[in-house]
Amino acid sequence: MAFCAGYFLRKYLAEAKIASAEAQAKKILEEAEKEAEAKKREAILEAKEEVLKLRNDMERENRERRLELQRLERRLVQKEETLDRKVDAIEKKEDALNRKEAEIDAIKAQLNEIYKKQLSELERISGMTSEEAKQALLSDIEKEIQHEAAMLIKEIESKAREEGEKRARDIISLAIQRCAADHVAEATVSVIPLPSDEMKGRIIGREGRNIRAFETLTGIDLIIDDTPEAVILSGFDPIRREVARIALEKLIVDGRIHPARIEEMVEKAQKEVNVQIRDAGEQAVFETGVHGLHPELVTLLGRLKFRTSYGQNVLKHSIEVAHLAGLMASEIGVDIQMAKRAGLLHDIGKAVDHEVEGPHVAIGIDLAKKYREAQEIIHAIAAHHGDEEPKSIIAVLVQAADAISAARPGARRETLEAYIKRLTKLEEIANSFDGVEKSYAIQAGREVRIMVKPEKIDDLGAIRLVREITKKIENELDYPGQIKVVIIRETRVVEYAK
């Protein structure tokens, strides 16, 4: 019974649960259906709203497009109306232009007829054809233009010359001011002081053997006269004279004077002079800032220390020219080192011109070529005395610096008598030619100005005369550097207005 009761109870409970579950499921299903129906209605409503919105947007866009099209149509109509008005205006202008052209053609025809009549009348009156008159007019115009052009060219040349001369004076004066140079003293002989006159006898030696040995070894004349406590060394070679001076001073200090000792001292003096030469060359290179010279050229520069020209030490002159050329080069923007190098080497031929035949310019050119100097340096050496026409700015600068160094006060010396004779002779040569009225030697004899009679000497005659005078000066007169010959021909015409 209990089993059966439990069975039925469990069955009843199960059926009750099933019924409850079914009822709950049915309820859930109904709620889901209701919710789905609500969402469906909501979706349909949203879709309808979207469609309505799209329809409104399209209608708005269509309205805007219609309005834009209406505006474009109105603008197009306005442009067409404007274009029509312009076309009408152009057509009217063309008609007016055609009428004007017709009027102008008629006027041209009338003018042409009048011109022909006037031309015929002018030809009849003047007796010239139109072509002849045209040529005469062109000839007059050409002459007038040529005259104006010549005047303009002359004015431009004059201004350029004035500006160039002013600039050149400024450059040269600045270079001279910045270059401090010594005044040189002429050295033709060497005077050796003696401790006493007894030393003269020892220098002469028994039967003159010491003095003969000394002169033979040095090639220098040893002059012993009445000058108290001094002897004189005389010779044309300054290097040999310096060797003799050093050797004699050493002998005097040593006191042992005989041929063997003289030979020994001369050899020592020669070595000392060689050292002096080398040192002088190196000092010159250092002082001017010129580098890369061949060692032999440095030695040759040192030899210039013992070389003089009109009393001016050639090495000091070369250093001065190098400085002047460099300073002027810096003012005009030219290679300063090249200018200094050319200035330092311009007189290098004078180092050996007493040993080698030929002028020092030609010797200098050969030396520069031998030691592979630049062509510009070689040309500057060749042109510094006018043997060649200067073709580079460096050559012109070296030529100018050389002239400045040689011409400055105190640089070179001549006796007063020789100076006066040279200037007098210069004026006599100029006055010896027919047609010369008077002449003046100026610039310390470096320029002669000659006044000629214009009725006897014309322009071509002046050219011939200056060449003849120059040639006669070269043949008959000895002078340093060069002389500028200037002929002045002046014609004066005077009339009085009353």
UniProtKB/Swiss-Prot annotation:
<dbReference type="Pfam" id="PF01966">
    <property type="entry name" value="HD"/>
</dbReference>
<dbReference type="InterPro" id="IPR004088">
    <property type="entry name" value="KH_dom_type_1"/>
</dbReference>
<dbReference type="InterPro" id="IPR004087">
    <property type="entry name" value="KH_dom"/>
</dbReference>
<keyword id="KW-0694">RNA-binding</keyword>
<comment type="function">
    <text>Endoribonuclease that initiates mRNA decay.</text>
</comment>
<dbReference type="Pfam" id="PF00013">
    <property type="entry name" value="KH_1"/>
</dbReference>
<dbReference type="GO" id="GO:0005886">
    <property type="term" value="C:plasma membrane"/>
</dbReference>
<comment type="similarity">
    <text>Belongs to the RNase Y family.</text>
</comment>
<keyword id="KW-0540">Nuclease</keyword>
<protein>
    <recommendedName>
        <fullName>Ribonuclease Y</fullName>
        <ecNumber>3.1.-.-</ecNumber>
    </recommendedName>
</protein>
<dbReference type="InterPro" id="IPR017705">
    <property type="entry name" value="Ribonuclease_Y"/>
</dbReference>
<dbReference type="Pfam" id="PF12072">
    <property type="entry name" value="RNase_Y_N"/>
</dbReference>
<dbReference type="InterPro" id="IPR036612">
    <property type="entry name" value="KH_dom_type_1_sf"/>
</dbReference>
<dbReference type="GO" id="GO:0004521">
    <property type="term" value="F:RNA endonuclease activity"/>
</dbReference>
<feature type="domain" description="HD">
    <location>
        <begin position="314"/>
        <end position="407"/>
    </location>
</feature>
<keyword id="KW-0378">Hydrolase</keyword>
<dbReference type="GO" id="GO:0006402">
    <property type="term" value="P:mRNA catabolic process"/>
</dbReference>
<keyword id="KW-0255">Endonuclease</keyword>
<feature type="domain" description="KH">
    <location>
        <begin position="188"/>
        <end position="273"/>
    </location>
</feature>
<dbReference type="InterPro" id="IPR006675">
    <property type="entry name" value="HDIG_dom"/>
</dbReference>
<dbReference type="InterPro" id="IPR022711">
    <property type="entry name" value="RNase_Y_N"/>
</dbReference>
<dbReference type="InterPro" id="IPR006674">
    <property type="entry name" value="HD_domain"/>
</dbReference>
<dbReference type="InterPro" id="IPR003607">
    <property type="entry name" value="HD/PDEase_dom"/>
</dbReference>
<dbReference type="GO" id="GO:0003723">
    <property type="term" value="F:RNA binding"/>
</dbReference>
